[in-house]
Regions:
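A structural detector for beta-sheet-dominated domains
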Residues: 44-46, 78-80, 131-133
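Surface-exposed short loop/turn segments
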Residues: 73, 78-123, 142-143
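Short hydrophobic beta-strand segments
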Residues: 31-49, 74
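Short acidic low-complexity segments
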Residues: 61-73
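Amphipathic alpha-helical segments
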Residues: 47-59
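Sec-dependent bacterial lipoprotein signal peptides
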Residues: 1-22
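C-terminal/domain-edge helix-coil "capping" segments
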Residues: 108-112, 121-164
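Bacterial Sec signal peptide processing site at the extreme N-terminus
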Residues: 16-37
């Protein structure tokens, strides 16, 4: 009985610490950004299972209206795998674990997102650095908006508008 209670306690502590994170988009202006421009109808030319994350980010960006019919689309989009770059190490986690999550830490990561816009045999290569950081803090356990793809979509929308 004691062993079972120790195992359950360890599982509860691990799940508590694994749920204390959230994502933030930088710069702050991108967080509330809304696309008011007319959207083009787009067709993704390479929808594979290995690119599900990238396609979800592109759909979350609200840049295009996606069609499953290639003849109805104004442009075709070829998506490339996202490249993740971690600019910080995990040493800050030690301080957070010692203080039981009361001191927040932030991992500032840069993700390189690239795709091609193909319109009538003219291909335009788009490549953006998405600045999405992960914050680990005890009180983020009560934040339920923890979807990385939506946050990366906001960052993509901001970068796309600023770098047309």
């Amino acid at each position: 009985m004691r062993i079972l209670s120790k195992i359950l306690f360890c599982i509860a502590i691990m799940s508590l610490f694994s749920s204390c994170y959230t994502y933030k988009v930088f710069p702050k202006e991108y967080r509330k950004l809304v696309n008011n421009e007319p959207k083009k109808v787009a067709f993704i030319s390479n929808p594979t299972d290995s690119l599900k994350k990238e396609i979800s980010i592109l759909q979350s960006s609200d840049l295009f209206i996606f069609s499953k019919d290639s003849t109805a689309a104004e442009i075709k989009i070829k998506v490339y795998p996202i490249k993740e770059g971690r600019r910080s190490c995990g040493q800050g986690t030690i301080l957070t674990m010692i203080t039981i999550g009361q001191v927040p830490i932030r991992f500032s990561d840069i993700y390189t997102f690239s795709f091609d816009e193909i319109k009538k045999d003219v291909s335009v290569k788009r490549k953006y650095d998405l600045k999405v950081s992960q914050r680990i803090w005890f009180w983020d356990m009560f934040v339920f908006n923890k979807n990385f793809n939506k946050k990366a979509g906001k960052a993509l929308l901001g970068e796309y508008k600023n770098n047309k």
